[in-house]
């Protein structure tokens, strides 16, 4: 799965640029995955909780994603790619929240060990992003299409080897998910997650283009993406200790503030390679510790039969709504204000998320 992400996220925008699409068109196409995340994870999560089985749905989603993706080989028109990517994203974006639920279901009370499982996804990302970086410097960008196809075939095969966890009943099972969502702690978490994903909109849409435009080779681009994920792996390994030292909520607040610093560094210091490297190391916080703490907090708030819906809601609000908003804003800002200002604006979303989380969190809820 994350080898696919390591192939698609850094390089797909370069493929779209090679087809002659404008910056805003690229932003729209890249945002389709976030658009689908607004409703698809919650829909499939509801179905999984209703049926009481997650793994068969994961298998169906993997198969339907594979069939949808084949459409990219048939035409390169903007309207066709729009339709294909929207259909693909509807199936693909729903699988990760279900996998998160399955993983946390197997871990039980040992949720602080989540990072040790998730780091294997990061390793897959690194191998894909570095390998393709070198290959795309040598071969035509269309090689990317076949590499992504290989990743999706592998996901489909491995989905049939995932064990189904036992769903543990909880006293909140009889309650409504709306009652959980209206809790101030949950609202604070969702607001913060929306802002963090909005901050990353420009990063996931234009970062590779931004680096190439400033003279970095595709191999260098691959290594920079990989460096961020290596830092992410290290933070995943340290999360059990960090959680005991600081708690999940403090980790989330710190991660949001670091996003403000990171995207300003990328925006204003792209020509200083050592600053770019340092900014990528900060991915450990802006994704690694942020995501691990957000997933764990979601798992704490949504129990029993609400677990899949909870993870789906987290994905919908953050990567769906927040990612779509951030991606579309970045597409407009890129053409209106330029690349550096776009990254600086994105940093403000991280700062706003930090302030919102602290402001909305109930006084009795210890940070």
Sequence positions of predicted segments:
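Interfacial helix-cap and linker-helix signal at transmembrane-aqueous boundaries
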Residues: 16-17, 47-48, 119, 134-139, ...
């Amino acid at each position: 799965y994350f080898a696919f992400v390591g192939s698609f996220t850094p390089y797909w925008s370069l493929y779209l640029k090679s087809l002659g699409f404008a910056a805003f068109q690229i932003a729209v196409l890249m945002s389709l995955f976030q658009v689908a995340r607004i409703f698809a994870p919650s829909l499939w999560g509801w179905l999984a909780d209703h049926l009481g089985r997650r793994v068969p749905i994961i298998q169906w989603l993997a198969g339907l994603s594979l069939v949808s993706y084949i459409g990219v080989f048939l035409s390169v028109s903007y309207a066709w790619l729009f339709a294909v990517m929207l259909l693909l994203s509807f199936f693909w974006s729903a699988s990760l929240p279900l996998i998160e639920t399955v993983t946390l279901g197997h871990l039980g009370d040992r949720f602080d060990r989540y990072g040790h499982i998730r780091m294997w996804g990061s390793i897959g990302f690194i191998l894909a992003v570095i390998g393709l970086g070198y290959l795309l410097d040598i071969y035509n960008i269309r090689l990317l299409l076949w590499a992504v196809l290989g990743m999706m075939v592998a996901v489909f095969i491995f989905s049939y080897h995932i064990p189904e966890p036992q769903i543990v009943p909880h006293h909140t099972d009889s309650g409504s998910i709306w009652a959980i969502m209206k809790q101030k702690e949950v609202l604070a978490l969702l607001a913060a997650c929306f802002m963090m994903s909005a901050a990353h909109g420009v990063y996931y849409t234009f970062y590779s283009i931004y680096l190439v435009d400033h003279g970095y080779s595709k191999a260098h681009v691959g290594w920079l993406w990989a460096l961020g994920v290596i830092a992410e792996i290290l933070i995943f390994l340290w999360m059990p200790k960090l959680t005991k030292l600081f708690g999940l909520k403090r980790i989330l607040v710190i991660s949001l503030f670091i996003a403000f610093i990171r995207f300003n560094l990328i925006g204003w210091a792209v020509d200083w390679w050592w600053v770019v490297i340092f900014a990528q190391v900060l991915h450990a916080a802006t994704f690694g510790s942020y995501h691990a703490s957000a997933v764990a907090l979601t798992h704490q708030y949504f129990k029993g039969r609400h677990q899949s819906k909870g993870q789906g809601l987290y994905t919908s609000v953050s990567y769906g709504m927040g990612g779509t908003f951030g991606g579309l804003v970045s597409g407009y800002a890129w053409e209106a204000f330029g690349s550096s200002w776009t990254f600086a604006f994105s940093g403000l979303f991280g700062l706003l998320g930090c302030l919102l989380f602290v402001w909305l969190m109930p006084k009795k809820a210890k940070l």
